[in-house]
Design a protein with these regions (language model features):
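Trp- and acidic/polar-enriched beta-sheet ligand-binding modules for extracellular glycan
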Residues: 64-68, 79, 90-153
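Disordered, acidic Ser/Thr/Pro-rich linker "stalks" and the adjacent N-terminal cap
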Residues: 15-79, 87-98, 149-153
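Short, flexible active-site loop motifs that bind/organize anionic cofactors or intermediates
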Residues: 4, 74, 140
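Acidic-enriched, low-complexity/disordered segments with a strong bias for Aspartate over Glutamate
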Residues: 10, 31, 42, 54-55, ...
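Aromatic/acidic polysaccharide-binding cleft in carbohydrate-active enzymes
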Residues: 1-12
Length: 153
């Protein structure tokens, strides 16, 4: 007989998923990273550090006609990187059409991801790479890209 309640196995699985999400995305390693961009300032003279704030009130917007952007993160020492979270400032529309993620290993750059759209939120599995440098390279966008958040966990 059905009770209209969620089965206890499903409840346990949902709690486990909630704990995984909470623990995995608790501490953003970007908070302790140096962050630079090419171009170095956005069209409103804002520093790239605004990308640490996870909201739509702060964003980094390229000059009109500049459809490429590189976001560089560097740490003092190597970190184990599991996930990268990217967000576009959706109030300005989804703009990114092609991007890649690269990291430094033994003095050379290696590509660990390439994709098309970012949109509201893109979560990328970095598979636990060990590095002190990560670059997000927006290679093409419909119009100047507007990024609102970068997180590394």
């Amino acid at each position: 007989m059905k009770s209209g309640r969620i089965h206890e196995t499903d409840v346990a699985n949902l709690k486990q998923l909630g704990e995984f999400i909470e623990n995995t995305f608790k501490y953003n390693l970007v908070d302790e990273a140096g962050i630079t961009t090419i171009p170095p300032l956005d069209c409103q003279e804002k520093e790239p550090t605004v990308l640490r704030t996870d909201d739509y009130e702060t964003y980094f917007m390229n000059e009109a006609g500049t459809n490429k952007l590189m976001i560089k993160l560097n740490w003092v020492e190597k970190k184990k990187l599991n996930y990268l979270v990217l967000k576009e400032a959706i109030p300005f529309s989804q703009r990114v059409e092609k991007f890649k993620v690269c990291y430094e290993e033994n003095g050379s750059m290696k590509e660990c991801y390439n994709g098309t759209t970012i949109g509201y939120k893109k979560i990328i599995d970095l598979k636990g790479i060990q590095t002190d440098f990560l670059a997000i390279v927006i290679e093409d966008s419909r119009v100047a890209p507007v990024m609102s958040f970068v997180g590394v966990y």
